[in-house]
């Protein structure tokens, strides 16, 4: 099982270059496979949208918390590391035009020599998506087409370019270079907590990252993903399952449970009370030692 660590944005310093490099280099040194960056293009004060991962419906982040663009952050980290994977968790797909996003992801993957893993989400904050020009109510249908656009542009190498004629996006003779480092393109995972996210992962995703789910809810989502994959003529086992945990609580017993569920990767967060980068580093080091990574 591969292990990633989420950038602890709640500490408020992820826009500091020395801070983020210390975090990333420490993760690489300790044997973690990747770091994962989150996204909010804007945060809207007093949003009317309920945050789905808290019983209060409110995000734990203050409005003025540093939230760097995840792809720019990962590009910065790529140049200062050698083998560390570069992931998002999640990139809010409705905030991005897929033609532009395809170029950005391909460039990052090419320059990092294939270290990129993108987990896409549809977002929960209506005001954020609408501020970016997105259609909140139709974002699921648009996302399906956006994924097809990106993969078509990455695969298109012929002299005539790429034609695409969809409901939301259309172009003819389009050339988008450089291509991703990997011929199969940048891996696109689907993150979310809804049945729609699970089904989308089964139909279209290279992986599924269920967010905020445990117990029967998690089992149900995994089943929904696998049934959707089968219905689409895909091998459910080819859709990598990514599970979450906190750094202090992960041990071999939890790893074994993740393996039994079919997980190939785990994404780990610092404890809510970590409070500082030095404490996060201590949690990372202790986790790596428990699991024999160092």
Question: Which role fits each region the language model picked out?
Answer:
Residues 1-294:
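Active-site-adjacent structural elements that line small-molecule/cofactor binding pockets in enzymes
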């Amino acid at each position: 099982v591969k292990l990633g660590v989420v950038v602890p944005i709640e500490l408020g310093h992820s826009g500091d270059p020395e801070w983020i490099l210390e975090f990333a280099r420490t993760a690489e040194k300790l044997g973690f496979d990747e770091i994962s960056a989150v996204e909010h293009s804007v945060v809207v004060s007093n949003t009317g949208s309920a945050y789905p991962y808290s019983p209060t419906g409110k995000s734990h982040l203050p409005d003025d918390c540093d939230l760097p663009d995840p792809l720019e952050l990962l590009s910065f980290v790529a140049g200062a590391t050698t083998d560390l994977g570069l992931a998002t968790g999640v990139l809010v797909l409705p905030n991005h035009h897929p033609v532009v996003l395809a170029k950005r992801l391909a460039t990052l993957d090419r320059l990092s020599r294939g270290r990129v893993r993108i987990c896409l989400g549809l977002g929960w904050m209506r005001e954020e998506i609408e501020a970016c020009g997105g259609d909140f109510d139709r974002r699921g249908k648009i996302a399906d087409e956006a994924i097809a656009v990106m993969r078509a542009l990455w695969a298109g190498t012929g002299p005539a370019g790429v034609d695409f004629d969809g409901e939301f996006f259309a172009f003819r003779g389009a050339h988008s270079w450089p291509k991703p480092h990997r011929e199969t393109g940048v891996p696109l995972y689907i993150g979310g907590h809804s049945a729609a996210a699970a089904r989308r992962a089964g139909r279209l995703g290279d992986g599924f990252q269920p967010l905020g789910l445990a117990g029967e809810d998690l089992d149900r989502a995994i089943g929904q993903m696998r049934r959707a994959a089968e219905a689409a003529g895909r091998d459910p086992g080819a859709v990598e399952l990514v599970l979450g945990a906190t750094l202090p609580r992960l041990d071999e017993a939890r790893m074994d449970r993740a393996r039994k569920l079919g997980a190939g990767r785990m994404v780990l967060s610092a404890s809510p009370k970590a409070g500082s980068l030095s404490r996060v580093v201590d949690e990372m080091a202790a986790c790596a030692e428990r699991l024999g990574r160092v």
